[in-house]
Amino acid sequence: MSREAEEQLIERLHEPKTQQAAFAELVKEYSEPLYWQIRKIVLSHDDTDDVLKNTFIRVWTSIENFRGDSKLSTWLYRIAVNEAITFLNKQRSLNN
């Protein structure tokens, strides 16, 4: 996604009237790359799907906090990695 397209998407995500459509576009654009990033960490397909869903829930609830200090994709990947690590830590604590 170009920087200009990303900036337009961010503007639409911050507008209540266009937020849902913009979020659907974000999910369509980033689902596959985020899936594979999470899959490298989590390994299981089913668990990766769960973490990906949690990632998008976190993005939806936190989008108003995105300030644009980094690219949107960088912010999304950071959330995905954090969600994957949180998942692994929970799994580890359940197994102990």
Question: Where do the PLM segments sit?
Answer:
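N-terminal module of bacterial RNA polymerase sigma factors
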Residues: 1-33
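Short, charged helix-capping/linker segments at alpha-helix termini
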Residues: 15-25, 35-54
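Structural recognition of an alpha-helix C-terminal capping motif at a helix-to-coil junction
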Residues: 36, 50-57, 70-82
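Short alpha-helical functional segments enriched in proximate histidine and acidic residues
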Residues: 37, 41, 62, 83, ...
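A short, glycine- and basic residue-enriched loop/turn
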Residues: 45, 49, 63-69, 73, ...
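Arg/Lys-rich amphipathic alpha helix in sigma70-family domain 2
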Residues: 65-67, 81-96
